[in-house]
Amino acid sequence: MSSRSTWALLRLPLPLIRICSGKWGLRLQEKPALLFPGMAASTVQVAGRKDYPALLPLNESELEEQFVKGHGPGGQATNKTSNCVVLKHVPSGIVVKCHQTRSVDQNRKIARKVLQEKVDVFYNGENSPVHKEKLEAERRKRERKKRAKETLEKKKLLKELREASQNITEKKADADGIPRGFQE
């Protein structure tokens, strides 16, 4: 059975499979935080980001690229190799550091995507698709918070009504002389 027919059995859209499949099989990717000038974000946060066709293209002559030694978890293999990419957009002064994978090529691609988004936000501001998505995510978060608050208030009201009805039932039973263990 070919790998193509195996994926067909899962009935997932092909673009989703390409995004989510990797070295270790299918995995869910969480939505990353959005990037704005001055806002710090690790490259791990931007792993599953959508591609925006309307972003400003990067001119390779305006970029300075360096490869430095990595850091963090992974032990000596990570700390000895120079697979961490530092990419600088000279005109804007934006610097991106990417050490998400052990592969230099993958880190270069990820760094360019992140830099392209940051440069687009830097030059286009509120008109940038990245900025628009950030605003939409904030709106959805506010709506979820509002719904959760309303649900909590309804639950509190229901609890108060239950307690009030139990108190009335107990008072009525006390007035009728029925022992508490024999109430309905």
Swiss-Prot record:
Basic and acidic residues compositional bias, start-end: 149-184
Molecular function per GO: ribosomal large subunit binding; translation release factor activity, codon specific; tRNA binding
Residues modified as N5-methylglutamine: 76
Any one annotated GO CC term: mitochondrion
Region entry Disordered, spans: 132-184
Renumbered ranges of motif GGQ: 74-76
Positions in coiled-coil regions: 130-178
Classification via InterPro entries: Mito_Transl_Release_Factor, Pep_chain_release_fac_I, Pep_chain_release_fac_I_sf
Entry annotated with the keyword Cytoplasm: no
Function: Part of a mitoribosome-associated quality control pathway that prevents aberrant translation by responding to interruptions during elongation. As heterodimer with MTRES1, ejects the unfinished nascent chain and peptidyl transfer RNA (tRNA), respectively, from stalled ribosomes. Recruitment of mitoribosome biogenesis factors to these quality control intermediates suggests additional roles for MTRES1 and MTRF during mitoribosome rescue.
Homology family: Belongs to the prokaryotic/mitochondrial release factor family.
Name of the protein in question: Mitochondrial translation release factor in rescue
